[in-house]
From Swiss-Prot:
It comes from Escherichia coli (strain K12). Disulfide bonds: none annotated. The gene is galU. Its EC number is 2.7.7.9. Belongs to the UDPGP type 2 family. Signal peptide: none annotated. Homotetramer or homopentamer. It comes from the Bacteria. Its cofactor is Mg(2+). GO terms for molecular function: identical protein binding; magnesium ion binding; UTP:glucose-1-phosphate uridylyltransferase activity. This is UTP--glucose-1-phosphate uridylyltransferase.
Length: 302
């Protein structure tokens, strides 16, 4: 049984995927490094972790993802140039990419054997501790919720208080494309957690246990590690994280947490384009001008 007083301070972000849904843009650039206005996608996910109180982040990478590692490393030459040219605001932005109190590490996933395997690759670094798992394709809209209080931050608080693993969910129209949780029909409001009894991967609409799909945020007790280690290959001959979660549900209480606000699936072209527009019109310096241009292009009268 998970130790209730163990705090979640470590997160695993799997970034080894090849991003085939975003080709040809991702042929030479990791999908996680595609920009969302003026920051790469991975930066938003890391910022979310930091806002939630995470201090150690493990990126599970691939040999083609060196630019992600470089992004979070110190660039002495760039910083010296910005200092020399008195570009103080840009220098501050570059230096804030990875705050001093946060450690970002990398481990390699040598073979593409599924999400469960990717998380397991981080076990030697995380150790036998509870962990947050964050899928970088999904961006939680920072304009629709408070990253320091809601969603991942709230899931971590809930785990720290109860010892119950947390799986983030949100209602979807098409359940056949997602992992769907079974909460025995209990109604769930945004910000609430209730015990779940199982996960069904991509169910048929007429037999789906709910319309609550997993969003891509998990806070898991340390008991997940031995279960992942013994999880056999499942769909696609890959080690599935949901299979290990099903075993965890048999062992202890696992709760579904209803996301606050909205999410953006930036792992597909339409979702990425929608996120870019929404973040563009809300940007603190470019938003007003961009929105005016967009309205003019669309023929929208003020």
């Amino acid at each position: 049984m998970a130790a209730i007083n163990t705090k979640v301070k470590k997160a695993v972000i799997p970034v080894a995927g090849l991003g085939t849904r975003m080709l040809p843009a991702t042929k030479a650039i990791p999908k996680e490094m595609l920009p969302l206005v003026d920051k790469p996608l991975i930066q938003y996910v890391v910022n979310e972790c930091i806002a939630a109180g995470i201090t150690e982040i493990v990126l599970v990478t691939h040999s083609s993802k060196n630019s992600i590692e470089n992004h979070f490393d110190t660039s002495f030459e760039l910083e010296a140039m910005l200092e020399k040219r008195v570009k103080r605001q840009l220098l501050d932005e570059v230096q804030s990419i990875c705050p001093p109190h946060v450690t970002i590490m990398q481990v390699r996933q040598g073979l593409a054997k599924g999400l469960g395997h990717a998380v397991l690759c981080a076990h030697p670094v995380v150790g036998d501790e509870p962990v947050a798992v964050i899928l970088p394709d999904v961006i939680l809209d920072e304009y629709e919720s408070d990253l320091s209080q809601d969603n991942l931050a709230e899931m971590i608080r809930r785990f720290d208080e109860t010892g119950h693993s947390q799986i983030m969910v949100e209602p979807v129209a098409d359940v056949t494309a997602y992992g769907v949780v079974d909460c025995k029909g209990v109604e769930l409001a945004p910000g609430e957690s209730v015990p779940m009894v199982g996960v069904v991967e991509k169910p048929k609409a007429d037999v789906a246990p709910s319309n609550l799909a997993i969003v891509g945020r998990y806070v898991l007790s340390a008991d997940i590690w031995p279960l992942l280690a013994k999880t056999p290959p499942g769909a696609g001959d890959e080690i599935q994280l949901t299979d290990a979660i099903d075993m965890l549900i048999e062992k202890e209480t696992v709760e579904a947490y209803h996301m606050k606000g909205k999410s953006h699936d930036c792992g597909n072209k339409l979702g990425y384009m929608q996120a870019f527009v929404e973040y563009g019109i809300r940007h603190n310096t470019l938003g007003t001008e961009f929105k005016a241009w967009l309205e003019e292009e669309m023929g929208i009268k003020k």
